[in-house]
Amino acid sequence: MLPPLSSSPVQPNHPWRRWLLLSVGLGVAAVAGVLLWQQARQRRQVFVSITSWPANEYLYLAEQKQLGQPFGIDLRVKQSSSLEDQRLAFVRGDVNVMATTLPEAIAVCQEAPARCPELVLVMDESVGADRLIARQLLASPAALAGQRVGLERTVLAEYLLLRSLEGHPVDIEDLQLRFEGPVALVELMRAGAIDAVVSYPPYDFPLRQDKRFHEIFSSRLMPGEVVDVLAVAPETVRSHQREIQALVRTWWAAQAYARRHRSEAVGVMAQRQQISPEEFNQSEDRLRYPSASQQRSLLADDGPVAQTIERMAGLLRAARRIQPDAPLPRPTTALLADP
């Protein structure tokens, strides 16, 4: 028989052994807690203002699935009720990053030149999602003279209306404009209080199934002009480059997640928009998502986005919607990041 290793073996329930185990356990927990705290501190909160629009829901998906954490950020979306409310919040400095349209970015430069944003990512292009819908008796935009036309008080809505009237003997001053929020506009249209409306998903779904109405113009007829971008305040670009690059990577992570888990992702995004997954898929049929490899050419100094901004500004100046001497948003490739 082997002799005992000690003449006075330590019993499992000895008081100082329990104290030692407790001390070791507390030490391990403390170290783990410190590491988690340090990781949390290293993840910067990044707030992005969004409106109700199918492409913007990918940012919400990224927030819910914490897809920014591998890149060192904690993404938080801030919902705005309309493009106008979002733009005014950006002008005031309440938000520094927003997913918005080119016309709204142009408007920021008019209202607050010092806040004129830099455009760091092209999120999507509307290829028919933004629509001018009218009563069946109104066959084309030329028939809108003297009619009641509803739209949001946004530069995008006015721009789409101006583009629809090009080539027709009708000016925007010939229309009876009615300004309301996106939900109220659809209700006015269904009630017969207006004759045409500028609308988009998810708000336009009740009008799609109503045989009293039809589409007379859409962004499909103005390719490359209605795009959504990540617009960032210039001081934020200078002071938080790493976080903005991480945000761009998070966008690509959300796109990749949605490809891998399509049903789940669509369910999350559709529920937030209060539409069915089928309707969400339908709304995406009228969108195009540029790839990561296309971003550098899109955002080049003389690229498509810069050229579109110049064309838009020219039309808005001619319509006396903006001042001729204000700066314009600047596309930049400096903060592009690979997925």
Predicted segments with their positions:
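N-terminal Lys/Arg-rich, disordered targeting/topogenic segments
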Residues: M1-H14
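Twin-arginine (Tat) signal peptide motif
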Residues: N13-L21
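Hydrophobic membrane-insertion alpha-helices, especially the h-region
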Residues: L21-V34
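Short, glycine-/small- and polar/acidic-enriched structural segments
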Residues: G33-D171, Q176-F179, D195-S199, H214-I216, ...
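Pocket-lining segment of extracytoplasmic ligand-binding domains
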Residues: L102-E104, L177-R178, V183-Q273
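Secondary-structure end/capping motifs
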Residues: S239-R321
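Conserved C-terminal helix/tail region of periplasmic/extracytoplasmic solute-binding proteins
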Residues: E310-P339
